[in-house]
Amino acid sequence: MSVVPPNRSSTGWPRGVNQFGNKYITQATKPLTLERTINLYPLTNYTFGTKEPLYEKDSSVAARFQRMREEFEKIGMRRTVEGVLIVHEHRLPHVLLLQLGTTFFKLPGGELNPGEDEVEGLKRLMTEILGRQDGVKQDWVIDDCIGNWWRPNFEPPQYPYIPAHITKPKEHKKLFLVQLQEKALFAVPKNYKLVAAPLFELYDNAPGYGPIISSLPQLLSRFNFIYN
């Protein structure tokens, strides 16, 4: 049985090298939260209305990457944020997704403006996409970042890490858990449907929902859900 000397790190490579180099370790380290409790409410608690269609900025995938290329030359890496809204049906968590057509699903969110704060930007985007039309301000509660994805090139593939040898990713996407109030009214653009997809349907289902949405069951497994 080998024993690691007390003054020697047991992590990193080569042996004894800490990959963070104590860069992120301070004396005033925050206490670790071992369990995070999130309240979920039934889907039937929420009312869904409609509003005018909300169209994408780009008419095609090729046009989207061309605009991304042009903007990258001017302002650098694109920053996008998306919100994960969860309800429950029969004590099973469901994620609210926007459906366009018959096979395309997305999380609500979008591009941040240059210099825009991530949380404030996501609140703005959530209001634009799902905000009610009667002037009542929606209260979006955003406390937890649950995932980071990077696009290394001007192409569809995205990864939950920056691939080796990539020094200038073209897009950084952050996923945030948006905690819903007990009751709320959402206005959905007419060209979309808002669907509630159970976690068991998303799990390991990249062909149906893409790699990001299908990874949500793993990302959400760290939370302790309370079914109200």
Curated annotation (Swiss-Prot):
CDD domains documented for this protein: NUDIX_Cfim25_Nudt21 (cd18871)
InterPro entries documented for this protein: Cleav_polyA_spec_factor_su5, NUDIX_hydrolase-like_dom_sf, NUDIX_hydrolase_dom
| Entry superkingdom | Eukaryota
Keywords annotated in UniProt: Cytoplasm, Differentiation, mRNA processing, Nucleus, RNA-binding
Q: GO terms for CC?
A: cytoplasm; mRNA cleavage factor complex; nucleus; paraspeckles
Give the signal sequence positions.
Answer: none
Gene Ontology MF annotations: identical protein binding; mRNA 3'-UTR AU-rich region binding; mRNA binding
Picking any one GO biological process from the record gives:
mRNA 3'-end processing
Residue stretches making up the Nudix hydrolase domain: 77-202
> What are the start and end residues of every segment in region (Interaction with RNA)?
103-105
Localization of this protein: Nucleus; Cytoplasm
Motif Nudix box per UniProt: ranges: 110-131
Site (Interaction with RNA) location in chain:
E56, R64
The record's similarity note reads: Belongs to the Nudix hydrolase family. CPSF5 subfamily.
Function according to Swiss-Prot or TrEMBL: Component of the cleavage factor Im (CFIm) complex that functions as an activator of the pre-mRNA 3'-end cleavage and polyadenylation processing required for the maturation of pre-mRNA into functional mRNAs. CFIm contributes to the recruitment of multiprotein complexes on specific sequences on the pre-mRNA 3'-end, so called cleavage and polyadenylation signals (pA signals). Most pre-mRNAs contain multiple pA signals, resulting in alternative cleavage and polyadenylation (APA) producing mRNAs with variable 3'-end formation.
Self-association or partners: how does it assemble?
A: Homodimer (via N- and C-terminus); binds RNA as homodimer. Component of the cleavage factor Im (CFIm) complex.
Q: List the protein's name.
A: Cleavage and polyadenylation specificity factor subunit 5
Record organism: Danio rerio (Zebrafish)
Q: Which gene encodes it?
A: nudt21
